[in-house]
């Protein structure tokens, strides 16, 4: 009995807690990643004691606001796959370099030590992956054993190497569906009312979301008739000529524009003077800018819409493939952590990405 008790004590001493946090803009399926992280962790009772979630992302660690997920019901955890948004709260907070703000990293390790956390899973985009890597570095310098893994999430689909990123598929489906439905509306009213419809979508540097509007096309003359990508310089004259020609030919024109399109000088055409927590220029206003051009230069009645939060929170229209990917990265993040992988980010790849469906 004494021996068994000693063994139990030693095993419990080896067990560590896992800290999971969500970061950046949320998606229709990010909670579908959180659920598998929690359930998969339970399959490793000898290595993992509890799963803590950060309240409002990494701020939950810095402010020592940890959510003990073991207190949540099984029904609640299972329901996460159906909930859009970030159930534990997210944040836009970028840790500076270790040299610039060593104290913040030391604070993280201090909190992790206090709560016996040995695994850190950070669910976000490029900046979040960078943060996870930096934390893995500082933990080694501070001689604190901590396994750090970045779990991919971004609607922009701009993470390197990966074929597709959890969050994108659902936005692509929403945008394509919305464009198709809105175009039928405009087509119905073209004779005596609206001639041009402009839909602004997310995508600062990557045009994946805007390009997904093309999925609405089934025939040659179907909308969208114009797609504006951030990778290509915006040519005002060419844009107006194409709108004019399309309206003359079809009676209406539908445009899908990325928020990140730039002018000839390389500046965002909708850039404001403010910046977000990551230092990125705040964008927004591409659609009204284009609408004003159409009104003033072509004198055509038009309407515009900004998909904004709607595109990334539309769980009712989520992609099943996207959902499966989101669940898989959560599950495998835990498995890879148990295998000792550290300072890495999960990526989804396939031999034939074009065979995959949204």
Question: Which role fits each region the language model picked out?
Answer:
Residues 35-43, 67-73, 134-147, 165-170, ...:
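A glycine- and small-aliphatic-rich helix-loop capping segment at beta-alpha/alpha-beta transitions
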Residues 348-358:
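Single conserved hydrophobic/aromatic residue that forms the stacking wall/gate
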Residues 277, 282-289, 295-346:
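C-terminal catalytic subdomain
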Residues 15-65:
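N-terminal phosphate-binding or glycine-rich loops at protein starts, especially the Walker A/P-loop
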Residues 65-117, 127:
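Glycine-rich oxoanion-binding loops at beta->alpha junctions
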Residues 17-27, 87-92, 118-124, 150, ...:
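Short glycine-rich or small-residue beta-strand-to-loop segments that form or flank ligand, phosphate
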Residues 23-25, 54-59, 92-93, 125-126, ...:
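Short, ordered loop/turn segments at secondary-structure junctions
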Residues 122-124, 130-139, 165-303:
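Accessory alpha-helical/coil subdomains and C-terminal extensions
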């Amino acid at each position: 009995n004494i021996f068994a008790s000693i063994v139990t004590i030693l095993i419990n001493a080896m067990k560590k807690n896992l800290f999971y946090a969500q970061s950046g803009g949320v998606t229709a399926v990010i909670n579908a990643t959180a659920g598998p992280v929690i359930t998969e962790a339970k399959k490793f009772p000898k290595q993992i004691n509890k799963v803590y979630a950060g309240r409002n992302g990494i701020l939950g660690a810095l402010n020592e606001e940890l959510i003990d997920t073991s207190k949540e019901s099984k029904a609640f955890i299972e329901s996460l796959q159906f909930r859009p948004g970030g159930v534990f709260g997210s944040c836009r907070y970028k840790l500076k370099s270790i040299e610039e703000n060593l104290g913040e990293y030391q604070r993280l390790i201090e909190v992790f030590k206090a709560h016996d956390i040995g695994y850190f899973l950070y669910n976000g985009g490029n900046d979040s992956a960078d943060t996870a890597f930096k934390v893995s570095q500082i933990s080694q310098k501070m001689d604190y054993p901590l396994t750090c893994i970045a779990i991919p999430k971004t609607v922009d689909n701009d993470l390197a190497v990966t074929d597709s990123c959890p969050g994108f598929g659902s936005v692509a489906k929403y945008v394509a569906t919305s464009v198709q439905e809105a175009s039928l509306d405009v087509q119905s009213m073209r004779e005596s009312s609206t001639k041009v419809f402009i839909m602004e979508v997310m995508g600062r540097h990557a045009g994946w979301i805007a390009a997904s509007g093309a999925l609405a096309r089934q025939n040659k003359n179907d909308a969208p008739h114009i797609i504006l990508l951030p990778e290509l310089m915006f040519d005002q004259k060419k844009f107006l000529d194409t709108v004019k020609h399309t309206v003359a030919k079809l009676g209406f024109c539908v445009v899908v524009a990325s928020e990140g399109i730039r002018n000839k000088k390389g500046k965002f055409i909708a850039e404001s003077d403010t910046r977000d927590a990551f230092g990125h220029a705040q964008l927004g206003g591409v659609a009204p800018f284009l609408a004003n051009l159409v009104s003033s230069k072509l004198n055509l009645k038009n309407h515009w819409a900004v998909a904004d939060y709607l595109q990334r929170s539309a769980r009712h229209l989520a992609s099943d493939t996207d959902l499966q990917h989101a669940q898989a990265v959560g599950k495998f993040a835990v498995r890879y952590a148990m295998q000792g992988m550290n300072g890495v980010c999960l990526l989804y790849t396939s031999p034939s990405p074009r065979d995959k469906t949204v």
